[in-house]
Swiss-Prot record:
EC identifiers of the protein: 3.6.1.41
Record field: catalytic activity: P(1),P(4)-bis(5'-adenosyl) tetraphosphate + H2O = 2 ADP + 2 H(+)
Function comment: Hydrolyzes diadenosine 5',5'''-P1,P4-tetraphosphate to yield ADP.
UniProt keyword Disulfide bond present: no
Disulfide bonds: none
Family per similarity comment: Belongs to the Ap4A hydrolase family.
Protein name: Bis(5'-nucleosyl)-tetraphosphatase, symmetrical
Taxonomic lineage: Bacteria, Pseudomonadati, Pseudomonadota, Gammaproteobacteria, Pseudomonadales
CDD domains for this protein: MPP_ApaH (cd07422)
Gene label: apaH
Top-level enzyme category: hydrolase
């Protein structure tokens, strides 16, 4: 039995299948962790979601911002933007079971035996792991509650509040939790977010750092796997931080990480998110 983690899929099914073939993934015995952003922008969002649903018993999945956007568009199609590739999912005859499965997924996963956490964007520096798990559960409960789902999905958009306070309530509280776990890149040591800057490590606004670079970060005792930040290209100079979004949908690569051995595998992607031909999977012992 092997456990693998894969970076942002964003509807790029061919590169995912390339990686699974590369490691001889067997859904009967192996496990696949997904860092979120399963859909959107790539060429096969519906097919990707259907494939994941077919092997759902083998998956551990956390939701990304694009997955939450899809759920919001499911309830209000006017949420769709021109750049979205999600309409085919909403209009699919099997949409309901796909959406019901999606809304059951987590925002934060923790494997206690391995000491590894996984979130789409990361864990803000001012939260302990226990706090992060508790706050994530608040959003997860809203997603699974039919009476609260629409209110949450309509209210989750926006950049404010840009900092956590235990006194926050209602949809504002859920929004900032969501932004930390699914949209965060740069923040201050106190957790004030900058959600506009999306480039690499050297582009931090004054007073801000990548969330994982703060020396006082309270989750340092855990290894954290995350995606979301394609501009990093998987490169972080920080022990215990595993960045897996390597920009497949932008013509980069899709990266798979063996959670137990530490080995990386990569399949290169074409500019349209399909598999670059000829397909030449790469095994990387030292991910660079």
């Amino acid at each position: 039995m092997a456990t693998y983690a894969v970076g942002d899929l964003q509807g790029c099914l061919q590169p995912l299948k390339c990686l699974l073939e590369r490691v001889s993934f067997n859904p009967a015995v192996d496990r696949l962790w997904l860092v979120g952003d399963l859909v959107n922008r790539g060429p096969e969002s519906l097919e990707t979601l259907r494939f994941l649903y077919s092997i759902r018993q083998s998956l551990v999945c956390v939701l990304g911002n694009h997955d939450l956007h899809l759920l919001a568009a499911w309830h209000n199609v006017e949420r769709l933007k021109k750049s979205d590739t999600l309409r085919e999912i909403i209009e699919a005859p099997d949409a309901d079971p796909l959406f019901d499965w999606l809304r059951q997924q987590k925002l934060l996963h923790y494997d206690e035996a391995r000491g590894i956490a996984m979130a789409h964007a990361g864990i803000p520096p001012q939260w302990t792991l226990g706090q992060a798990l508790g706050y994530a559960a608040e959003v997860e409960e809203a997603l699974r509650d039919d009476s609260r789902l629409k209110l949450y999905l309509d209210g989750m958009y926006g950049n404010e509040p840009n900092k956590w306070s235990k006194n926050l309530t209602g949809v504002e509280r859920l929004r900032v939790i969501t932004n930390y776990l699914t949209r965060m890149r740069f923040c201050t040591a106190e957790g004030k977010l900058d959600l506009k800057s999306k480039e690499g490590l050297g582009t931090a606004p004054k007073g801000y750092k990548p969330w994982f670079a703060h020396k006082g970060r309270r989750s340092r005792h855990v290894t954290i796997i995350f995606g979301h930040w394609a501009a990093l290209e998987g490169r972080v100079d920080e022990p215990g931080i595993i960045a897996l979004d390597t920009g497949c949908v932008w013509g980069g690569a899709m990266t798979l990480y063996n959670v137990d051995s530490g080995e990386y595998h990569r399949c290169d992607c074409a500019d349209d998110g399909t598999l670059r031909q000829p397909a030449q999977p790469t095994t990387l012992n030292d991910h660079t």
